[in-house]
Design a protein with these regions (language model features):
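N-terminal nucleotide-binding beta1-loop-alpha1 segment
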Residues: 1-34
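Conserved alpha/beta core of the MobA/IspD/sugar-nucleotide pyrophosphorylase nucleotidyltransferase superfamily
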Residues: 5-6, 12-13, 187-236
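A short, N-terminal amphipathic alpha-helix
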Residues: 47-63
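Acidic donor-binding segment of Leloir-type glycosyltransferases
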Residues: 64-86
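Short phosphate-binding loop-to-helix
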Residues: 79-113, 188
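Short beta-strand-to-loop acidic/aromatic patch adjacent to the donor-nucleotide binding site
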Residues: 112-120
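Conserved donor-nucleotide/metal-binding helix-loop-beta segment in metal-dependent transferases, i.e.
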Residues: 124-164
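Short beta-strand-to-loop element that shapes/binds the nucleotide-sugar donor at the catalytic cleft/hinge
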Residues: 159-176
């Protein structure tokens, strides 16, 4: 059986052919750690608004060829289809298994790179995704120039946006889609960086607005402090 995490034969990296995957565990019971600040109905509205915003931002970003939502939740998939995303029903397993399904989809459609975008980033905007892709292209061009002068070649690129604690991964770009295995979970930032190093990938880490995710009441306060709280979460 083919290993879905195994890199394929190296090819020129084209960051104008990016597939985006948005993993969603579910809408009904999401973000229970926000229970001290939001009731179940408010949490549901928050998660739904963030998912819609994430899809809209990705669909409108130049260079992103297609956007898919992978989820075991029929409600999340219906929302995704309504918002214009491809839907990938997840049969089982956790986040990394769902992303492996997304990787297989990206390969089937011939994408040169895969962008993983969690659906809990209040600062998600097309402008932010464009900034990430532009920084990736600039870093890739500089690395290609450096390695070319040294007589070697760039075969893989990994770009990561860490969370505010610099422990988790808030956004991950991998080129080609199989450049590294997914290691989302506790300590994922270090795990992804180590995987990039072992695989000989060019690695770039970018902090910024997308380093804020919504997991705790303190995160909600941080979002509100920079004008991203309340109803704004559901707006484009």
């Amino acid at each position: 059986m083919q290993d879905r995490d195994r890199p394929t034969t190296a090819a020129p990296i084209d960051l104008g052919q990016v597939a985006a995957i948005i993993p969603v565990r579910g809408l009904e019971r999401a973000k229970t750690r926000l229970g001290e600040a939001l009731d179940p109905e408010e949490r549901h509205a928050l998660v739904e608004g963030l998912l819609r915003r994430t899809i809209r931002a990705a669909v409108a970003t130049p260079g992103i060829r297609a956007v898919a939502v992978v989820s075991p939740d029929p409600e999340a998939l219906a929302l995704a289809a309504d918002a214009g995303a491809v839907t990938l029903p997840q049969g089982g397993g956790g986040l990394n298994e769902g992303l492996a399904d997304g990787r297989a989809w990206a390969r089937e459609m011939g994408a040169a790179a895969l962008l993983v975008i969690p659906a809990d980033l209040p600062a998600i905007r097309t402008s932010e995704l464009r900034r990430i892709l532009e920084a990736a292209r600039d870093h890739l061009a500089a690395s290609v120039a450096d390695t070319g002068a040294a007589g070697t070649a760039v075969t893989a690129l990994v770009v990561l946006v860490p969370d505010r604690a610099r422990e988790g991964t808030n956004l991950l770009l991998v080129a080609p889609p199989g450049a590294i295995p997914f290691r989302f979970g506790p300590g994922s930032r270090a795990a992804h960086a180590a995987a990039a190093s072992r695989g000989g990938a060019v690695y770039l880490e970018l902090a910024g607005p997308l380093s804020l995710d919504l997991d705790t009441p303190d995160d909600l306060l941080a979002a509100e402090a920079i004008g991203l709280g309340g109803p704004v979460v559901g707006q484009p």
